[in-house]
């Protein structure tokens, strides 16, 4: 087996099982669309590679997924992207509060918080979800298979069906693309 085949094996197995997430994916997309239609926005948060994927998600919503499908920009914010706020809050309140303080400042009941985590146990994401729940927000978790605290707190859970950290992140990217595609379909009225 080549090194690429070795790396791809757990991903291939996980991708084969992603079909089991159709219902939670549709429910998450529906919640996001309801938020947008009521004047809300999507807030996204993650750490490390998951932060990069959170920003990828917000870029797809503000931009577009399909070049042939023009649509309005959708309101989405990656909470890790404002480095001045991140470091100020981290310095004054601690790393565990870097996302929660932002949710407290800009989160509203009509908004959605989407968190990405391979561990499902990052304290700064748990604090952010708590802050979102206190505001009456819908929360979505793109997580790993192993049930951790975030699984219990999020309104919708899209759990990558693997224990491989790399495959979890790679599944999250697929889930992001499918989620944005579902949102675009619902907004365009073309969802089957």
Residue ranges with predicted function:
Residues 1-20:
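Generic N-terminal amphipathic, Lys/Arg-enriched alpha-helix
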Residues 17-38:
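A short, well-structured juxtamembrane/interface segment
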Residues 34-107:
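Glycine-rich, small/polar surface segments that engage phosphate groups of diverse ligands
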Residues 39, 110, 136-137:
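Glycine-centered short loops/turns at secondary-structure junctions
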Residues 50-55, 121-128:
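Short glycine/serine/threonine-rich phosphate/pyrophosphate-binding segments
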Residues 105, 167-192:
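A charged, well-structured terminal subsegment
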Residues 113, 139, 156-158:
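Short, well-ordered beta-strand core segments
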Residues 142-154:
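Short, glycine/polar-rich helix-capping loops at beta-to-alpha or helix-loop-helix junctions
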């Amino acid at each position: 087996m080549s090194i690429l085949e070795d790396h791809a094996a757990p991903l291939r197995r996980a991708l084969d099982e992603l079909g089991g997430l159709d219902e939670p994916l549709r429910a998450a997309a529906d919640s996001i669309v309801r938020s947008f239609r009521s004047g809300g926005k999507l807030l996204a948060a993650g750490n490390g590679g998951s932060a990069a994927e959170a920003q990828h998600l917000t870029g797809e919503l503000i931009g577009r997924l399909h070049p042939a499908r023009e649509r309005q920009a959708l309101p989405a914010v990656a909470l890790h992207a404002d480095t001045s706020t991140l470091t100020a809050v981290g310095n004054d309140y601690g790393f565990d509060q870097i996302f929660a303080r932002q949710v407290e400042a800009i989160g509203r009941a009509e908004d959605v918080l989407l968190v990405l985590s391979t561990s499902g146990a990052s304290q700064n994401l748990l604090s952010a979800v708590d802050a979102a729940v206190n505001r009456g927000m819908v929360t979505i978790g793109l997580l790993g298979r192993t049930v951790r605290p975030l699984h219990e707190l999020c309104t919708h859970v899209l759990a990558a069906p693997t224990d491989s950290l790399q495959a979890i992140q790679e599944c999250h990217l697929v889930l992001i693309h499918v989620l944005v595609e579902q949102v675009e379909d619902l907004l365009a009225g073309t969802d089957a």
